[in-house]
């Protein structure tokens, strides 16, 4: 009888431990929803308190913005006055890491000098990297965008991508080594032909962002835009970060593009993500030339 009781208590204990472990597992879908909710609160704060106040509230202390190169976002917005500038945006695509602490979203944006203006004077797309903070809040780690023509089609609905469960745990150091090796191969290939290099390492649904164009989604759609700006490209990385689950990463920095018309200098930003086989793929590519003086 005593042995039976001990076995029963041991079984209950192991069951409770199992349930606690399962409860502690990160939920990427729930995290993606929280991230998108933070994005919408970011926008709502801008509508209620002003764009400057919104950026200062939702940027991480080390968050990056591009003006045109990478700068500390809080320092940039802290120096700007609140002008009434009206910035409207809505996330239409979101992706989350397996560790549920690191994700990104993107979508259309439009702006005007203030709400008194009848028409919006500019249209574009934003891309934001979000990271979960120690206090459980979500903050913007990096924010950038492009300008494009005024859209004429129906507004997109939100699409959310989260990774599936792995059969075996991922070793962080091994994944980091694989990421660095993959990106090194990409940069070497780009020195010969940037378009071919991008398509070679791209995910099937890569998103390519260039000023003056709507985002190109998918290899076939991206090919003409990549070909139009192709050249012999060299990269100088200035910053990078990766999720704790080692399945989502970004890099940014400077580039030099040698083309027939001359050499173009600019800044780049890329998001890399592992596929089902654990191979690193380029899922988002943004590049912007430095404005001519």
Language-model regions, residue ranges each:
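Short, low-complexity N-terminal intrinsically disordered segments enriched in polar/charged residues
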Residues: 23-52, 56-58, 148-196, 200
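A solvent-exposed, acidic/Ser-Thr-rich amphipathic alpha-helical stretch
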Residues: 29-33, 50-101, 120-121, 195-247, ...
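Short, structured motif recognition centered on aromatic/hydrophobic residues
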Residues: 42-43, 89, 102-106, 127-130, ...
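Bacterial N-terminal signal peptides that target proteins for export
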Residues: 1-10
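Hydrophobic/aromatic beta-strand elements that line small-molecule binding cavities or substrate pockets
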Residues: 77-79, 91-96, 108-111, 125-132, ...
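Bacterial N-terminal signal peptides
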Residues: 9-18
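Short beta-strand edge/turn micro-motifs at domain boundaries
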Residues: 123-160, 265-291
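A mature extracytoplasmic/lumenal domain signature
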Residues: 59, 69-70, 100, 107-111, ...
């Amino acid at each position: 009888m005593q042995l039976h009781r001990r076995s029963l208590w041991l079984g209950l204990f192991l069951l409770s431990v199992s349930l606690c472990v399962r409860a502690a597992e990160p939920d990427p879908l729930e995290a993606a929803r929280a991230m998108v909710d933070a994005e919408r609160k970011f926008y709502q704060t801008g509508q209620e308190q002003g764009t400057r106040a919104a950026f200062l509230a939702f940027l991480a202390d080390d968050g990056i913005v591009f003006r045109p190169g990478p700068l500390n976002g809080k320092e940039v917005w802290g120096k700007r006055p609140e002008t009434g500038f009206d910035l409207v945006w809505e996330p239409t695509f979101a992706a989350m890491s397996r560790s549920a602490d690191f994700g990104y979203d993107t979508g259309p944006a439009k702006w005007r000098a203030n709400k008194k203006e009848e028409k919006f004077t500019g249209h574009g797309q934003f891309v934001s990297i979000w990271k979960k903070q120690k206090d459980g809040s979500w903050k913007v780690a990096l924010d950038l965008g492009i300008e494009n023509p005024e859209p004429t089609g129906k507004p997109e609905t939100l699409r959310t991508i989260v990774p599936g469960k792995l059969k075996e745990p991922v070793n962080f150091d091994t994944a980091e080594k694989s990421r660095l090796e993959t990106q090194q191969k990409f940069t070497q290939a780009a020195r010969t032909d940037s378009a071919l290099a991008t398509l070679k390492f791209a995910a099937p649904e890569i998103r390519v962002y260039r000023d003056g164009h709507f985002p190109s989604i998918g290899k076939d759609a991206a090919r003409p835009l990549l070909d139009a700006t192709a050249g012999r490209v060299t990269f100088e990385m200035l910053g990078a970060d990766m999720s704790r689950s080692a399945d989502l990463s970004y890099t940014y920095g400077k580039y030099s593009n040698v083309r027939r018309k001359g050499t173009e200098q600019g800044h780049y930003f890329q998001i890399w993500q592992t596929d089902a086989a654990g191979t690193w793929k380029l899922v988002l590519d943004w590049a912007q030339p430095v404005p001519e003086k």
